[in-house]
Amino acid sequence: MLKGMSFRWSLVIPVKTLVAAKTRLADATGPHRTRFAVAVASDTVAAALSCPAVARVIVVTADPAAAVPLAALGAEVVTDPDRGLNTALRTGAAHAVSVAPGEAVGALQADLPALRPAELATALGAAAEFDQAFVPDALDVGTTFYGVRPGVPFTPRFGGESRARHLAGGAKELCVPGIDSVRRDVDTPADLEAAIALGLGRHTAAVVAELWPRSGASG
């Protein structure tokens, strides 16, 4: 670890096939589940691209319904080999290193509809102090971000209780104040309510306002 150094980042964002996305929100979103998932991913990607610490965003997906709108926002799209989440992330990371070997590489979950560029910049600045680091989710069970400095092996351990696995793998847990939007992933209706309280990005806010007019969502 070299104190005080910072890097620009290549961020890899995995977007699963949308017919399988957000199953725990299926009852709430009904036939609009795909549209909702695209909106959430769009807000995540847009916020990441607006972060000054981010040089590029690489979306890994096999679904054209996600690839087309996310590429239109400015993301680079890499085809998901469909061998699991961590394989998808490693595929995106390999692409990042091939095009920008001097950049740090991070994995960011796609379901952060309240993500704020300034809060992401704070998290990335903290991560740059360590060879590998991660941000736990709001429940302190999963992980929303994992990143490594340039030249450090990229070994993501996402899925389920990934916080414990990232700790066991030697990654530094980033207990940084003021990054609530980086930690607030959305898998359930309760998660969505918490994200609404933080303030949704414009894509998700538009869908939520249409589906639930009294939600108080605003972009």
Feature roles, as predicted:
Residues M1-L25:
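N-terminal nucleotide-binding beta1-loop-alpha1 segment
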Residues L2, E161-G219:
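Conserved alpha/beta core of the MobA/IspD/sugar-nucleotide pyrophosphorylase nucleotidyltransferase superfamily
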Residues A37-V54:
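A short, N-terminal amphipathic alpha-helix
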Residues A53-V77:
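Acidic donor-binding segment of Leloir-type glycosyltransferases
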Residues P69-A104, S162:
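Short phosphate-binding loop-to-helix
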Residues Q109-P113:
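The conserved acidic donor/metal-binding loop of glycosyltransferases
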Residues L115-V141:
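Conserved donor-nucleotide/metal-binding helix-loop-beta segment in metal-dependent transferases, i.e.
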Residues T144-A171:
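Short, glycine-/small-residue-rich phosphate/pyrophosphate-handling segment
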